[in-house]
Amino acid sequence: MLDQIRNSQSAIRNPLVECVPNFSEGRKPETIELIARAIESVPGAVVLGRHIDPDHNRSVITFVAAPEVVVDAALRAVTRATELIDLRTHTGEHPRIGATDVLPFVPVSGVTIYDCVALAHEAGQRIWQELSIPVYFYERAALQSDRVRLEKVRGRGFEQLRDEITMNPERAPDIGGHKVHETAGAIAVSARPFLIAFNVNLRSNEIGIARQIAREVRERDGGLPCVKALGLALYTRGLVQVSMNLTDYCRTSIGRAFLAVRAAAARRSVEIAGAEIVGLLPRAALDRQASYFPLLENFRETLVLETLLEAAEIERQTKGS
């Protein structure tokens, strides 16, 4: 078995793209299952993981596919989400502009970030042409310099965008008309390197504390480089959360981000209740000896991207033998 795992690593060198769509639904697992099935209806597209959060009312699906089919799989996901999710009745802690809120393409192997930019632009064109959902490009796929950062694109969310898109030229989409889709809103499409979504839960119900700490640790307010952060409430658990995106784990690791949040919480006499990884992460980003690791509430080996790719290749080899 060890030899099989070592040999299977060659699969990671084949052209492969990761796609990580985020959906504005976290309270109906059956909806996310239907979207996942739509993705896997494209031959060669494999769903590696899903994360469903009822407080955020948001879900993340991670799938991989060859570059020639990844856009088809992404379009099937967006199409199914458009059929199943009505943003007009959506409530949740996480900001959003669309039923499929974000659609990032990430190079895994045999493709470059520039290839993923082209895939993102192709997906955006098709989303407008086939679904009439206005499209904004961000990160490496951005067409405007002030739209590189997702928070600039998202603003205050769907309700604000619904009003502003019709009258404010600065809020016009990169592709599409000056009106959001009635039920699906808009969508932000990107190409980016690996991003790690890492949340730290605080033993407090004061949302102001989480927001203060988020401001303290995020880059845009003078905190850690390559860290985006929000303070959110977890009403079902009676906790608050510092929700972070680490856009370059080589510059700010999970451990460094955790220590910064823990120190900021300690200064406010607040204990850490736990932590979680959302979606998948590269093996190189994980430090099993770090202080955060025992506090991970949801860790399992299948959160490691390479583990899933290796297992998928072993299954493929077994079926072919």
Sequence positions of predicted segments:
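Short, basic, low-complexity termini and linkers enriched in Ser/Thr/Gly/Pro
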Residues: 1-15, 319-321
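Long, contiguous binding/interaction regions
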Residues: 14-320
